[in-house]
Amino acid sequence: MYRVAKASEYLAITGAGIDDIKLQKKAWIFPGQSCTVFDLSPVNYTFEVQAMSAEKLPFVLPAVFTIGPRVDDQESLLKYAKLISPHDRHSNHVNELVQGIIEGETRVLAASMTMEEVFRGTKQFKQEVFDKVQLELNQFGLLIYNANVKQLVDVPGHEYFSYLGQKTQMEAANQAKVDVAEAKMKGEIGSKLRVGQTLQNAAKIDAETKVIAMQRAGESEKQGIKVRTEVKVFENQREAEVAEANSELAKKKAAWTKAAQVAEVEAKKAVALREAELQGEVEKMNALTTTEKLKADLLSKASVQYETKVQEANWELYKKQKEAEAILFEKKAEAEAQKALADSTFYARKQEAEAELYAKKKEAEGIVTLGNAQGAYVSTLLNALGNNYTAVRDYLMINGGMFQEIAKINAEAVRGLEPKISIWTNGGDNSGGEGAMKEVAGVYKMLPPLFKTVHEQTGMLPPAWMGSLSDKSS
C-alpha cells in the first residue's frame, strides 16, 4: 500500500526490513510493516505555575508555551516519533509531561531568587525559565517555538506585587515631577547661557581679530629687523676682514722696519718698539668699535622682543578681564544670584591670576633675552680683546663711567678746601732750605701707598715719572 503524508505530517514506518524507525513523507507499506502518521504542528499549552521565592513567598506565573517537534533535526524527529507520537498531542499524558517540566524548572529557579530579584529582573527570570525548560524538552525531541510568560500574579491573600506596583507608580510620578521642574530650570538657565555665550563669542572674535592684526604687524617688523641685522652682520664681517688685513700689513711693516733698524742704536730700537705698541692700540680701538656696533644690534633686538611680549601679555589680560565682566553681568540676572556671583568672581580672579602669571612669564622671558644679549656682547668683547680680562674690565669701567664717578666723588670730598702747607723749621745745624726740603720729601714718600690704594680700586698704574708702587705689605 502506498501512503503519502500531508505537508505537516510524517510517516513513521517500522517492521520487516527496518532496523529501528524510518521517517518518510511518502512510501510503500509492505506486508509485515506498520505505518503511523504523526503531526508536526506546534500546540499551545497554557499553565498557571505556582512557585515560591527564597523568602517562602508564593506567587503565580501565568505562561503560554507553543511547543512542537523539532523539524530541522532528524534525531529529534526520531525521539518524538518514539516517545510522543503514540499519544494524542492533546492528551493528558503529553500535557502533564510538559506541565511537569515547566513547573519543576520554574520552582527550582524561583527558590534560588528573592522576590525582589524576581520582580526587578522579570525579563531575565523568564529567559532562564525558557532555557531550562528547553534543555529538558530536548530529550523528547520537542522545541519551544514561543514562550509567553505573563506578568507575575499574587497568590490570594498575598499582596506583595500590588504593593511593589504602587511603590513603582509613586516613584515614577515623583520622578516625573522632578524631571518637569528640572526641565524648566534647564530651559531658563539655557536661555541665559545662550545670551551670555553670544556676547562672549562676539568679544572673543573681536579680540582674536585685533591679536591677529598685531601679530601680522609684529611679524612684518621682525622680518625688517632680521634683514637689517643680516646686512649689519655682513658689514661687520667685511670690516673685520679689512681690519685683519690692516693688522697683518701693519705687523709686516713693523717687522720690516724692525729688521731694517736692527743695526741702529738702542734709542731707535725703542722708537720702533713704541710705534708697534701704538699700532696695537689702534687695532684694539677698531675691535672696540666693531663690538659696540654688535652690542647696539643685539640690545635693540632684545628690547623689541621684550616690548612685543609685554604688549601681548597686557592685551591678553585686557581680554580676560572683559570676558570676566561679561560673565559677571549676565550671572547677576539669574535666579540664583549669590551663587552665580561667587562663581563668576572666582572665575574672574582665576583668569586675572593666570593673565598676571602670563605677563610675568613674558617679562621674565624678555629679561632672559636681554641677559643673553648682554652675555653675547661681553663674550664678543672678550674675544675681540684676545681674552684679556683686564682690558675688558677697563673698557667696561670706562664705558660705564666708573672713573668719572670716582673722580666726581673725590672732587666733592675736597671741594671748598684750600690746602696750605706751612713748613716750620728752627734751622738747627742745617740751613732752613734744607730742612724744608726734607719735609717736602716726606710728603712725596706718602705717594706710593696712595698709588697702591688707587691700583687696588681701579687696577691702574701711575706713570713712571710719578713713582712706583710700594712693595711693602701692610
UniProtKB/Swiss-Prot annotation:
Residue numbers with lipid attached (S-palmitoyl cysteine): 35
Question: Key word NADP present in the record?
Answer: no
The protein's UniProt keywords, in alphabetical order, are: Cell membrane, Coiled coil, Lipoprotein, Membrane, Nodulation, Palmitate
CDD domains named in the record: SPFH_flotillin
By its UniProt entry, which InterPro entries does this protein fall under? Band_7, Band_7/SPFH_dom_sf, Flotillin_fam
Coiled coil ranges? 235-255, 305-325
Q: Does the keyword Membrane apply?
A: yes
GO CC annotation terms, alphabetical: caveola
Induction note: Not induced during nodulation.
The record's tissue-specificity note reads: Expressed in all plant organs. Primarily expressed in vascular tissues. No change in spatial expression in root upon inoculation. Expression limited to the nodule vascular tissue.
Role description: May act as a scaffolding protein within caveolar membranes, functionally participating in formation of caveolae or caveolae-like vesicles. May be involved in nodule formation.
Q: Which family does the record assign?
A: Belongs to the band 7/mec-2 family. Flotillin subfamily.
Protein name per its UniProtKB record: Flotillin-like protein 3
Q: Which organism is it from?
A: Medicago truncatula
